[in-house]
C-alpha cells in the first residue's frame, strides 16, 4: 500500500509538471491571446486534507485550456466565497474524500448563494454521489451543481455548461435529472414508526 501511494504521488508530480508546461505554452499561444481562458477555482473543503483527486482535476483542466486557481486543502467556506468574489471564476470545483465533507459542501454553496454567486459548481470526491448532490447540495444553490464521477469528466462537463450553444440544454438536462432523483428518493422513503410501534414490530429470534 505504501509503495502504491508513493507511485501515485510520483505520477501526480510528473502530471503537475506537465500541466505547468502546458499552461505556459497556452499562455503564449495565439489562441490564448485571442480569447480569455475560462477560470476555475478549486478547493478541498474545510475538514478534509485529501488533495490527490483535486490535483488531478487541476492538471486535467489546465491541459484542456482552463486557468486553474487552486486554494489547496482544508479551505474554510468563507475563504472560498471571498476568493470567488475576488477573481470571478467561471466554475468552482469542490472536493472532499471524507463523509463530513458532504455537509461542508452544502455550507459552502449556501454561502456562495448568499453572496450572490451562481456560477456552475462541480462536486467531486470519493464520498460524493449524483444522488447526494441532487438531494442535499443542488437545492440550496441558485446555479447549477454538477457531480463529476472522476477527474476526466470535469473538463467536458464544464465546457458544456460554459458554451453558449450548449448551456441551456445542459441546464435543462441537469434539472430534469436531479428532479427525477429527488422524486425517486421520496418514493423510496419508508414511513417512520413511533417507539412503541417499533418495539411491537421487533423481530422474534427465539
Q: Model-derived features: where do they sit?
A:
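ATP-dependent carboxylate/acyl-activation modules
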Residues: 1-2, 25-94
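Arg/Gly-rich low-complexity intrinsically disordered repeat tracts
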Residues: 2-13
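Short acidic loop-to-helix transition motifs that present clustered carboxylates
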Residues: 73-80, 128-130, 153-154
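Glycine-rich, charge-decorated loop segments at or immediately adjacent to ligand/cofactor-binding or catalytic sites
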Residues: 127-142
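Active-site loops and adjacent core secondary-structure elements that bind or stabilize anionic groups
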Residues: 152-206
Amino acid at each position: 500500500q505504501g509503495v502504491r501511494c508513493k507511485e501515485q504521488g510520483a505520477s501526480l508530480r510528473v502530471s503537475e509538471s506537465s500541466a505547468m508546461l502546458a499552461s505556459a505554452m497556452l499562455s503564449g499561444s495565439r489562441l490564448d491571446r485571442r480569447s480569455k481562458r475560462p477560470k476555475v477555482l478549486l478547493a478541498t473543503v474545510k475538514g478534509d486534507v485529501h488533495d490527490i483527486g483535486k490535483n488531478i482535476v487541476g492538471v486535467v483542466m489546465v491541459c484542456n485550456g482552463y486557468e486553474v486557481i487552486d486554494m489547496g486543502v482544508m479551505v474554510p467556506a468563507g475563504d472560498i466565497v471571498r476568493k470567488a468574489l475576488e477573481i470571478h471564476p467561471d466554475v468552482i470545483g469542490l472536493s472532499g474524500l471524507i463523509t463530513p465533507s458532504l455537509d461542508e459542501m452544502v455550507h459552502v454553496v449556501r454561502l456562495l448563494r448568499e453572496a450572490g454567486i451562481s456560477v456552475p459548481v462541480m462536486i467531486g470526491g470519493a464520498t460524493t454521489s449524483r444522488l447526494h448532490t441532487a438531494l442535499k447540495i443542488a437545492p440550496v444553490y441558485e446555479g447549477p451543481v454538477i457531480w463529476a464521477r472522476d477527474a476526466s469528466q470535469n473538463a467536458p462537463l464544464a465546457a458544456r455548461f460554459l458554451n453558449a450553444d450548449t448551456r441551456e440544454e445542459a441546464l435543462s438536462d441537469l434539472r430534469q435529472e436531479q428532479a427525477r432523483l429527488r422524486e425517486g428518493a421520496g418514493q423510496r422513503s419508508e414511513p417512520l414508526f413511533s417507539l412503541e410501534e417499533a418495539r411491537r414490530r421487533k423481530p422474534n429470534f427465539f
